[in-house]
Amino acid sequence: MCGGDVQGQGVASGCDEALERADSLRASDPVPVESGEGSVPGEHSQELETGASEETLRERVNVLQEQYLRKAADLENYRKRALRERQEAVEHAYAALLADIVAVLDDFDRAIEAADHASSTEVEASSAFREGVLMIRKQLSSVLETKYGLEYYPVLGERFDPNLHEALSMSPSASVHEKIVGAELQKGYRVRNRILRHAKVMVLTPEEQTEPDRGDGPSE
């Protein structure tokens, strides 16, 4: 034990040095830190900033994803619209061409009809002519129908429909109860279910039903 009366001054000095040394050793020993305590200053705030940055990035990614999907949808709609407009332009060009060719078919029909009404002295010659014209017309009609979708639609006896028929004349008839196509004056054609030329027709209409005049009653 340091500081006794029997010891000299040298011993007291040695005790002082030992105490100082013990103090210095205690100061240099690491202080035990419990879990969750003693973290580096600023570390918690840094973690908060990192979390906020990740959330911001997620939101940004979501925004970019939505923008991409919208742009992709707009591009697809544009592609479909351009394709549709191109198809309509092609069909319009076809329709203009086919409208002219239909007039040629009318000429064939007139030639065939003229051959049918030939005089007896011309029957043999007109029959051969008729067969030749009819064959050419059939071939042309087949090509137009197969390649371009042109087709003739029959109308005789059909119910009158202004979407299909153009009435050039009307005739009252007791044999009908509604407007009926009574005669085909010019053939109608359509291209892939779209009317190219309306059929020109004569329409039979119901006769007006009128009550007979009964007068004012029996006379006295």
UniProtKB/Swiss-Prot annotation:
Keywords: Chaperone, Cytoplasm, Stress response. Gene3D superfamilies: 3.90.20.20, Head domain of nucleotide exchange factor GrpE (2.30.22.10). GO terms for molecular function: adenyl-nucleotide exchange factor activity; protein homodimerization activity; protein-folding chaperone binding; unfolded protein binding. It comes from the Bacteria. Signal peptide: none annotated. It is found in: Cytoplasm. InterPro entries: GrpE, GrpE_coiled_coil, GrpE_head. The keyword Cytoplasm applies. GO terms for biological process: protein folding. It holds the Pfam family GrpE. PANTHER family: GRPE PROTEIN, GRPE PROTEIN HOMOLOG, MITOCHONDRIAL. HAMAP family: GrpE. Belongs to the GrpE family. Participates actively in the response to hyperosmotic and heat shock by preventing the aggregation of stress-denatured proteins, in association with DnaK and GrpE. It is the nucleotide exchange factor for DnaK and may function as a thermosensor. Unfolded proteins bind initially to DnaJ; upon interaction with the DnaJ-bound protein, DnaK hydrolyzes its bound ATP, resulting in the formation of a stable complex. GrpE releases ADP from DnaK; ATP binding to DnaK triggers the release of the substrate protein, thus completing the reaction cycle. Homodimer. This is Protein GrpE. It comes from Treponema pallidum (strain Nichols).
